[in-house]
Design a protein with these regions (language model features):
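RNA-binding accessory domains that recognize and position tRNA/RNA substrates
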Residues: 3-197, 201-202, 216, 328, ...
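Proline-centered loop/turn at the N-terminus of a beta-strand
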Residues: 88, 164, 235-237, 253, ...
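Active-site-proximal beta-strand elements of phosphoester/diester hydrolases
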Residues: 164-168, 279-280, 319-323
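A short, acidic, flexible beta-alpha connecting loop/helix-capping segment that sits on the rim
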Residues: 315, 325-329
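Cysteine-nucleophile active-site neighborhood
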Residues: 205-206, 210-281, 286, 330-348
């Protein structure tokens, strides 16, 4: 595999499928991914399943690279793709042992380096990286210019646009945008630093806060904008980093987790109706339990560690989810959250139209 110097926070991911979507998820910026599944690369890489164009993680650590790829949609092999995206990789490691180390000791600052690197070079590399906490990575990966996303899910026809959604790009996954288009949304993707005033000039029916990398607390520009948008009577839906930023805008706090949640098999309970969904997860920060206030309802909790997975305003107009309802990869159990967002926009439009009469 392509091997060049890469340093980042080493985490482990327990998903058995979807390595392409994981590798190209911008939420993994400045991270190295240790895959617990023993063989990676067996389906190659295709253009349709990318979650970003630029690539996401800094590097991958695997047990075994598949010698063959079998997939009728394949455009490329994994090793060539990593080189194309400048993502480092290392194979033939005991990933089970490495995962146990990370589980017991937490995520670690780690590096992949060429064999000829000296101890002095390695020490200098580690001195150059002090972790993800306190870093605003959303600003780095966000689009520089606004654009309209029109692509629906694979082999789905585009529906007539019924709702206009402004989607904040903090590192947005493509499948999130596809699912919004599938539901009849005209999606305008805007840079992370877009002000609330500029957003409202677009006359949106709803605001979407995307996933993304890094620590949410330094993103003061986004928190400030979200606070202003909450005061306006408009539906808001956040995922992953967007969930955390919404929490901060609602005067909650966030904290770094020991090793985070990274996988496609995480059970989450809906506190309101007691249903359980298996979800895709990818986050290293969480909303602090101690910071909860009376203005926020906790809607979902992880059944692994009871951490907060979903929050909502009392009227349900503003809500968010920590995991990834869009999956990609993973189960689709909780994609109904997108439908809830659509219903919120529909209700708000009906109310607004009634007031005009």
């Amino acid at each position: 595999m392509y091997k060049r110097q890469r340093i980042g926070e080493l985490i482990f991911n327990t998903a058995m499928t979807g390595y392409q979507e994981i590798i190209t998820d911008l939420s993994y910026t400045d991270q190295l991914i240790c895959f617990t599944y023993p063989q990676i690369g067996n389906t190659g890489v295709n253009k349709e399943d990318l979650e970003s164009i630029a690539g996401g993680c800094s590097g991958i650590v695997i047990k075994e690279l598949s010698k063959t790829e079998s997939n009728w949609r394949k455009d490329n092999d994994l090793s060539s793709f990593l080189k194309e995206k400048n993502i480092s990789g290392i194979a033939n490691l005991d990933t089970r042992k490495l995962t146990r180390i990370l589980r017991d000791n937490g995520s670690q600052i780690s590096a992949i380096v060429p064999e000829e690197y000296s101890k002095k070079q390695i020490e200098a590399l580690f001195d150059s990286f002090d972790g993800i906490k306190g870093k605003d990575l959303a600003r780095e990966v966000s689009t520089r210019e606004a654009y309209i996303w029109k692509e629906p899910s694979y082999r789905k026809e585009t529906k007539k646009n019924s709702y206009k959604v402004v989607a904040y790009d903090f590192g947005v996954k493509h499948n999130i945008l596809r699912l919004l288009v599938d539901r009849g949304c005209e999606v305008l993707v805007v840079p992370a630093e877009t002000s609330a005033e500029d957003v409202m000039k677009e006359n949106p029916d709803g605001i979407f806060l995307s996933n993304g990398p890094g620590d949410p607390e330094p993103c003061e520009y986004a928190i400030s904008a979200i606070k202003k948008l909450i005061e306006i009577n408009i539906p808001i839906f956040g995922i992953c980093l967007g969930h955390q930023l919404l929490g901060l805008a609602l005067n909650l706090k966030t904290e770094k987790m020991k090793f985070g949640h990274h996988g496609a098999n995480h059970p989450v309970q809906n506190i309101l109706d007691k249903t359980v969904s298996i979800t895709s997860q990818n986050h290293g920060f969480t909303i602090s339990e101690e910071s909860l206030n009376d203005d926020v309802i906790v809607t979902h909790r992880s059944l692994f560690d009871k951490s907060i997975q979903g929050i909502s305003s009392k009227d349900g107009r503003v809500f968010s989810f920590q995991g990834h309802p869009e999956a990609s990869p993973g189960p689709k159990d909780i994609q109904n959250l997108f439908d809830k967002f659509i219903k919120n926009m529909q209700s708000q439009k009906s109310l607004t139209n009634a007031k005009k009469k």
